[in-house]
């Protein structure tokens, strides 16, 4: 390949991206005591940077991670993490979906929300959470895992 516009370079980039994504996801799945792989998609943020910060705040929240371990689609903990991110957010515009099912919007639970399909989704090993801030066009995707009793067992059983 001698030119930056060589189509083979695009093929290589796509293949390299696929390998890097797979490796990154394997690291998350291999977290100490992890049982669930969680994809958090944030949309409607003020910017891509804001969306990423919000996604990381959700993904790194011990309260969210323990709720995930328990199979609890606790939207209040997700809203708390959004607020802690320090980015622009409006509770009355916020929408939250778990496993493709809208569970909260405009500051409260969705009317007529059926928890059964969400509970089935939360019982699985691959969890999807979508947050729509309804403010702008910023988007981001973050991967995380749950936080289980096994994590405590692993990290509480040795000294350095």
Which residues make up each language-model segment?
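A structural signal for small-residue-enriched, beta-sheet-centric alpha/beta enzyme cores
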Residues: 1-160
